[in-house]
């Protein structure tokens, strides 16, 4: 049975004091929650947040890393440096990095492959824009992102892979896919993963697929009631402790 995940992506938000406060407030919730709880702080806050979360059930992940060991790559973070902080989970493919930094699914594939082969857990984000959805291209976009992003990933590596479906038009807009629309996309993603290689149907059945896009305490239960939705990758509602705790009830 797939365990539900609630993951908070803090992006470039929160002061250090705010990040620490939320982290401390989540520790006791982790002990009693049936969910797997993750937070993805700003790179500058990783060390402090990871220190607070050490020896707890709270998983601290990085919003980005580079697909290499220690090397000359200005402005990037190596998984080796993350490991020193006890961080073994990384986001890949978020729509903001695709849209504003020009990252492609092919580029994401190099990250995913490197990270998984070096023992990291990856949360791979996929999703369509509003223009793509209006043209009826949601499924073709998802097929392309899954096919290119996960190309060559072998079955043994999927145990450390999580998918997050984030329709770009619902991120930070207040819009949200209906539970039926979200379930439809999640079911399609699961089907596409099942077509990646011989025997991938079992991998597809076991992989956790999260929904992201204006997830809040008042809509999360209905979303998680759908059979193919295994949790949420949450932005705004994860940046206030009371709302984050509300997601876990």
Curated annotation (Swiss-Prot):
Matching Pfam families: TIM
GO molecular function, one term: triose-phosphate isomerase activity
Domain of life: Bacteria
Recorded catalytic activity of this chain's protein: D-glyceraldehyde 3-phosphate = dihydroxyacetone phosphate
A GO BP annotation: gluconeogenesis
InterPro entries, sorted: Aldolase_TIM, TIM_sf, TrioseP_Isoase_bac/euk, Triosephosphate_isomerase, Triosephosphate_isomerase_AS
Major localization class: cytoplasm
Annotated localization: Cytoplasm
Annotated metabolic or biological route of this protein: Carbohydrate biosynthesis; gluconeogenesis; Carbohydrate degradation; glycolysis; D-glyceraldehyde 3-phosphate from glycerone phosphate: step 1/1
GO CC annotation, single: cytosol
Binding-site residues, substrate: 9-11, 172, 214, 235-236
Keywords: Cytoplasm, Gluconeogenesis, Glycolysis, Isomerase
UniProt-listed SUPFAM superfamilies: Triosephosphate isomerase (TIM) (SSF51351)
PANTHER family assigned to the protein according to its UniProt record, in alphabetical order: TRIOSEPHOSPHATE ISOMERASE
Reported function: Involved in the gluconeogenesis. Catalyzes stereospecifically the conversion of dihydroxyacetone phosphate (DHAP) to D-glyceraldehyde-3-phosphate (G3P).
SUBUNIT field: Homodimer.
Annotated protein name in UniProt: Triosephosphate isomerase
Provenance organism: Leptospira biflexa serovar Patoc (strain Patoc 1 / ATCC 23582 / Paris)
Gene: tpiA
């Amino acid at each position: 049975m797939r365990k539900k995940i609630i993951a908070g992506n803090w992006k470039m938000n929160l002061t250090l004091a705010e990040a620490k406060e939320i982290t401390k407030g989540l520790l006791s919730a982790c002990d009693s929650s049936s969910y797997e709880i993750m937070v993805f702080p700003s790179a500058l806050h990783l060390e402090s947040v990871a220190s607070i979360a050490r020896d707890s059930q709270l998983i601290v992940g990085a919003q980005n890393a580079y697909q290499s060991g220690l090397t000359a790559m200005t402005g990037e973070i190596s998984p080796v440096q993350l490991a020193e902080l006890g961080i073994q989970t990384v986001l890949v493919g978020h729509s903001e990095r695709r849209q504003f930094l020009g990252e492609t699914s092919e580029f994401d594939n190099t990250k995913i492959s490197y990270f998984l082969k070096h023992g990291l857990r990856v949360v791979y984000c996929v999703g369509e824009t509003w223009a793509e959805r209006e043209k009826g291209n949601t499924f073709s976009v998802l097929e392309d992102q899954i096919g290119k992003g996960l190309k060559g990933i072998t079955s043994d590596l999927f145990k450390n892979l999580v998918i997050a479906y984030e329709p770009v038009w619902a991120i930070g807009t207040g819009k949200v896919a209906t539970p039926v629309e979200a379930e439809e996309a999640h079911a399609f993603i699961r089907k596409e993963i099942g077509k990646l290689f011989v025997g991938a149907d079992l991998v597809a059945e076991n992989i956790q697929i999260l929904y992201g896009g204006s997830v809040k305490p008042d809509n999360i239960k209905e979303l998680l009631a759908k059979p193919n939705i295994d949790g949420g990758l949450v932005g705004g509602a994860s940046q206030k402790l009371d709302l984050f705790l509300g997601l876990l009830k």
